């Protein structure tokens, strides 16, 4: 009986152990998903700060882009404003430049008009007195047209007169217009046959007559009287008593020089005008 009880208890213990073992296995099986779920949730909690940081960086980047866009917009507006201002200034500068050019043109025209009036008045005074301080020519020089003339009493060869005129900052007399001819020929009248060298010459009898600057002589203005009895290697022209003669360039004749007239001395007109208006 004891043996039967003992075997029965052993069987119960064995069943209990089996039951406990099955319960333990079931408990372990039921607990594994919870551990897996716990392990699955841990990475999610770890990425939250990273995601928050990335979101913050994105917001900062968006704010920076917005600020950059605002700055670019302001710079664009400022650039357009400055460009408009530059265009306006360039337009004003162009208008001022045109006005200045117009004033310069008017000033030049006024100066030319003043010069013509002063020259006309000075010429009237000069023709009345034969000499005036307003004359654009040096002292003792004769004013005619736009040139100054001087007929010297010194006698020299043709080349000597050339050097003499150069020393006086002038050239030898050139008769190339009717006005100059009508002015110069009366200066050649002399009771003692003093003729004046001109700047007209030629190298030989077969060559053309040329003035000192290389321009040709015009026979329509005056004729040159040539002495055919004497042959020379070089001929030069003198004027005497309203006529032109071919002479040996080595002969001694008086010098006639010319130079361009300067500006009329306007300030020298004030004194005669004040006396004239009194």
Curated annotation (Swiss-Prot):
Its membrane topology: Single-pass type II membrane protein
InterPro entries with a match to the protein in the record: C-type_lectin-like, C-type_lectin-like/link_sf, C-type_Lectin_Domain_Fam1, CTDL_fold, NKR-like_CTLD
Residues annotated as glycosylated: 95, 169
Domain C-type lectin: 144-258
MF terms in GO: carbohydrate binding; transmembrane signaling receptor activity
Membrane spanning residue stretches: 53-73
Topological domain ranges for the Extracellular compartment: 74-278
Cytoplasmic topological segments: 1-52
Disulphide linkage map: 165-257, 236-249
Main location: membrane
Name recorded for this polypeptide: C-type lectin domain family 1 member A
UniProt source species: Bos taurus (Bovine)
